């Protein structure tokens, strides 16, 4: 599981994904959490995560079903990982509340200010996955989309972050 982005200026942290993961743990389902520096670009983080995932798979050969879950920006990390990960029929990459459309100019002033102050200008963003969106990812991909009006961030955008299609991706 890979968490989303929680910048310092957010007053409260939204834990909508915590309860489902608590359930997995209570059911004795192996659950691994990956912590990363959310000030780094998702495409950069995905390189390290890919190596960690390969290590986990190799050291746990008895696990036959891997559900990789990324929430929000963590979902972007998951998609960049899937972009470069070798085919493995044991893996499903899941993205939860992850945009498939990003229009930086239409994001809030706070987001743009944060990006400027921390020089977080990633050369690759969600729009860098156009090839995968058009042709599909190598491994299975499932999208768990929030309703925009209930999502703590997306409801503030004046564009639809889900206005995009990923070939062969399952959408819930």
Where would I find each of the regions flagged by the language model?
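Conserved alpha/beta-hydrolase
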Residues: 22-40
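Serine-esterase "nucleophile elbow" of acetyl-processing enzymes
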Residues: 9-27
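Hydrophobic/aromatic beta-strand patches that form the interior of the parallel beta-sheet core
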Residues: 32, 94, 142-145
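Short, intrinsically disordered, charge-balanced linker/junction segments flanking boundaries
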Residues: 1, 6, 169-171
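C-terminal catalytic-base region of ester-bond hydrolases, centering on the histidine
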Residues: 127-172
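Serine-dependent carboxylesterase/thioesterase catalytic core
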Residues: 2-4, 11-15, 43-139
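Active-site loop/turn elements of alpha/beta-hydrolase fold enzymes
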Residues: 4, 34-38, 98, 146
């Amino acid at each position: 599981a890979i968490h989303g982005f929680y910048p310092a200026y957010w007053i409260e942290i939204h834990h909508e994904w915590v309860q489902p993961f608590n359930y997995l743990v209570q059911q004795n389902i192996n659950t691994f959490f990956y912590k990363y520096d959310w000030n780094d670009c998702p495409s950069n983080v995905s390189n390290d995560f890919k190596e960690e995932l390969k290590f986990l798979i190799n050291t746990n050969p008895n696990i036959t079903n891997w559900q990789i879950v990324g929430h929000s920006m963590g979902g972007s990390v998951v998609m960049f990982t899937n972009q470069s990960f070798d085919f493995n029929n044991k893996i499903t990459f899941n993205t939860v509340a992850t945009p498939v459309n990003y229009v930086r100019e239409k994001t809030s002033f706070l987001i743009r200010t944060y990006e400027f102050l921390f020089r977080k200008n990633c050369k690759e963003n969600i729009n860098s996955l156009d090839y995968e969106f058009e042709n599909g990812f190598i491994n299975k991909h499932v999208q768990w989309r929030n309703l925009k009006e209930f999502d703590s961030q997306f409801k503030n955008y004046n564009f639809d972050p889900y206005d995009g299609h990923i070939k062969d991706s399952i959408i819930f």
